Design a protein with these regions (language model features):
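Short, amphipathic alpha-helical "recognition" segments used to contact nucleic acids or chromatin
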Residues: 10-27
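Short, charged amphipathic recognition helices of the HTH superfamily
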Residues: 25-35, 162-164
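A general structural motif at alpha-helix termini
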Residues: 36-37, 48
């Protein structure tokens, strides 16, 4: 929490932007006034009132209790790639201590990694590597070992490949679902800029821009919200909930790079955690995302610069 506050205060942005971010973190107004406006409480009150008016009275909730972003959440990974036979990759994974099976295409959740076929991937020796349920930092450590093996086997990706992340959604309230959909929609322009062009307007990971904020806000059930967003080929896939009790994020490009995977998994974890308390406002800039620390903001700032060339 203190690190996030320091990061916000150090930003080269407006006082109003800092006030909004601190408010969303749950910092009391009097404290915000002390830190940002030299004690001008009225300025803070007016800035927050204008923020609410800009959002048309929407429920941009302050985080009234400190959110715990410790990563102990269940998650899953699907890695689409090519250039290694499934049999060889399975053998190398087993030698590295990773339990894996070679199977036909299926949606069954298994207690082991599975190598399946996927007709949407182009290239030689294509495959999809699907994880079992992973948990927190221990799960990331196992994923890193898998990435070492992918590197050993010279596994490659191209524009037909994606990295899909499932986040456990079993305990989501309907308010969390709405906040999550709205937050991703509002952040979509920012996320698009740190994703390759092939993942910005892709049939297999379509955006949420076709759904109005009002349609999301008025959804009363997960099925109703799913119906308004559409089929599973969207950046946020709610169909995964009925099958796996997860929400699937499909936008990330195919990769075998553990640093990219880790940062994206943690981004999604923090996004989901934040959605339990509120939603990210529309037109939020990368440096203003309330749930990212300074290190992740820098990482995605550099990714954005690299992909803008």
């Amino acid at each position: 929490m203190n690190e996030q506050i320091r990061s916000i205060l150090a930003q080269e942005t407006t006082k109003t932007s800092k006030i909004r971010q601190l408010y969303l973190l749950g910092v009391p107004r009097a404290e915000i006034a002390r830190m940002v406006t030299n004690g001008n409480y009225g300025f803070v009150v007016n800035a927050l009132r204008q923020m609410r008016e800009r959002e048309d009275g929407l429920s941009i909730h302050p985080v009234t209790t400190m959110l715990d972003y410790t990563f102990n959440r269940k998650f899953g990974i699907e890695i689409e790639a090519y250039n290694c036979s499934r049999e060889r990759l399975a053998r190398e994974l087993r030698e590295a201590g990773i339990e894996v099976m070679v199977e036909g295409y299926n949606h069954t959740t298994c207690p082991y990694w599975k190598l399946v076929t996927d007709s949407s991937i182009s290239g030689n020796d294509t495959f999809e590597l699907v994880s079992p349920i992973l948990v927190g930092e221990a799960g990331l450590q196992e994923l890193e070992k898998v990435c070492w093996v992918l590197d050993l086997c010279d596994v490659k990706v191209n524009e037909s490949c994606g990295l899909h992340v499932h986040i456990d959604a079993a305990g989501f309230s309907m308010e969390t679902w709405r906040n999550l959909a709205l937050s991703y929609k509002h952040l979509e322009p920012v996320i698009d800029r740190f994703m390759p062009a092939s993942r910005r307007d892709n049939y297999y990971c379509r955006g949420l821009g076709h759904v109005s904020d009002g349609m999301i806000r008025s959804a009363r059930t997960v099925d109703e919200l799913k119906g308004r967003i559409g089929d599973r080929y969207h950046k946020v896939n709610l169909e995964a909930y009925s099958r796996h009790k997860t929400v699937e994020f499909r936008q990330h490009s195919g990769t075998t790079n553990f640093t990219k995977m880790r940062n994206w998994v943690l981004f999604l974890h923090k996004l989901v955690t934040f959605a339990t308390r509120g939603q990210v406002p529309a037109a939020t800039a990368l440096q203003d995302i309330p749930f990212l620390d300074s290190e992740q903001k820098l990482y995605y700032k550099l990714r954005t610069k690299k992909l803008s060339v």
